[in-house]
């Protein structure tokens, strides 16, 4: 929950940039599920943040 969590999302966004757009949604879903498994629970806030990071990725 602390400010130290932010780099995780940025690193996640960095990795998502390397994924071609067709694979991006499944990969994002997988990332959400993985985070859910690791932390036990992912709140709506974290999910929103993940999607916000992902939606800021330019499609190239």
From Swiss-Prot:
Record-listed Pyrrolidone carboxylic acid modification sites: 1
Q: What is this protein called?
A: Flocculent-active proteins MO2.1 and MO2.2
InterPro entries cross-referenced by the UniProt entry: Bifun_inhib/LTP/seed_sf (IPR036312)
Specify the taxonomic lineage.
Eukaryota, Viridiplantae, Streptophyta, Embryophyta, Tracheophyta
- Report the function annotation for this chain: Is used as flocculent to purify water. The flocculation activity may be explained by the patch charge mechanism, due to the high charge density and the low MW of MO2.
Stretches for region Disordered: 1-21
| Organism, as annotated | Moringa oleifera (Horseradish tree)
Which terms are listed as keywords in the entry?
A: Pyrrolidone carboxylic acid
Q: Where is the composition biased (Polar residues)?
A: 12-21
